[in-house]
Amino acid sequence: MLGRKAGDNTQVRALADELGCGYEEKHILARPWELLVHLGSGVTLAGIDKSASTPLLPPWPDLVISAGRRNEPVARWIKQQSGGRTALVHMGRPWAGLDEWDLVVTTPQYFLPRRDNILHNSLPLHRLSREQLQAAADALSPELADLPRPWVAVLVGGDSGRFVLTGAKGERLGMLANQLAAACGGSLLVTDSPRTAAAAANALQAALTVPHYCYRWGSGGANPYRGILALADAFVVTGESMSMLGEAFAMGRPLLIFDVGDGPQPWWRLAHNFRYKPLSHRLAMWLGPERMRRDIGNIQAELVASGRARWLEPGAAGAAAQALTAASIAPEQPPGSLAARELTATVAAVRRLVTVR
C-alpha cells in the first residue's frame, strides 16, 4: 500500500520485493482534512479520495503492508472486509492501537514498547542490490569523469514533520559541504528531492564554489540518486530523512549528518513553523496519545554515538576531511551488511506470521 511519501514507499516495496511473493501496489491519496478523521479509532475510508486512489476490490489479500498514518484506515478496512483473514504489517509507528496489527516494524525515532508483535530495527528498510547499484554507477560515471575525487555526495531532503528546510538552511548546508570538499580537494555530487523547496535548493547551489555535479528534482533526465549512492566516497545527508540516512549508511562509507532543526529558540518565534506541515505535525503530536511521540534525533544520536556518523558542523571540515582520507585508504566496509541483516530478519518475521495464519 503506497502513499505520497517516498521513504514510506521505499520500505514497503523493499519488504514486498524481498518476500518474493506476487503482489499488487495500491496507491492511496488522502484528502487534505484526513487528520481530523484519523484521530478517531474507527475503521473508515472517509479520509481517502477514492476517485484518485487505486480501487479496492475483492478478492482480499492474505497480507497488507502499509506505512504512514494516511494508509492505516485503508489497511484495517481491508482486514475488516476479509473477515479478519488478512494479516496486517505496518512500517513505522501506527496511530491505531498496537493490537490492531499483526506486526509493526519500527525504528528508534518512535517510542514503541518491546512486545511480540513489534520488530525493532535500527534504520528504515531498503533494497538496493549490487546489480542495481552497478548499473546506476555505469550510467552516471561518464558525467563525473572530470570531477576530482574524493566525491562527496550531498543528499538533500526537505520539509518533514516539524522540520523546515528554509533558504537560509540550504545556504548553510551548501557552505558547510563546500568547506568539506575544499578541505579534502574533492568535489560534490548534489541531488535534491521532491520535498526540497526551490528557495533551499537555489541557495545551496549558489553557495558552491568547488567542482560539483548538481541534479535538481524535476529537471528532466534520469534520476542519478542510485548512481550517486554507488559512486560517492562519502555522504552528507539532511538529518530529517531517515530513508536517505539508511541508504547512505548502508554503502559503508563516511557519513555526515546536517541538522535541519532550528536550534534552541522556541518554535513559535520563527515564521516558517506556522506553515501547514510543521503546524499540523505539532497538532498531531499534541492530540495523539503519548505513544505517538516521534524523535528523529534518536536515530541521529545512535549513529553518531556508535561512530557510524558525525555531524556536519561549522569548523568541522578539517577533521571530517581527515576521516574521509583515512577511510579511503582503509579496507572498505561491506556495504549494506546491517541493512541486509535487518531486511532478512523482517522477511523471516513476516513469513512466520503468514505461515501461522
Write out the residue ranges for each language-model feature.
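Soluble, non-transmembrane catalytic domains of enzymes that act on hydrophobic metabolites at membranes
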Residues: R4-L29, G170, G174-M175, D192, ...
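Active-site and donor-binding regions of nucleotide-sugar-utilizing enzymes
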Residues: K5-H120, L245
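Conserved catalytic-core segment of nucleotide-activated headgroup transferases in glycan assembly
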Residues: D159-D192
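C-terminal amphipathic helix plus adjacent low-complexity
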Residues: P264, R269-R357
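Catalytic donor nucleotide-activated moiety binding site of glycosyltransferases and closely related
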Residues: C184-G220
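A nucleotide-sugar donor-handling region in carbohydrate enzymes
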Residues: D99-T166, A340
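A donor-sugar binding/catalytic signature common to diverse glycosyltransferases
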Residues: R4, G227-W268
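Generic beta-sheet signal
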Residues: M91, T107, N121, T191, ...
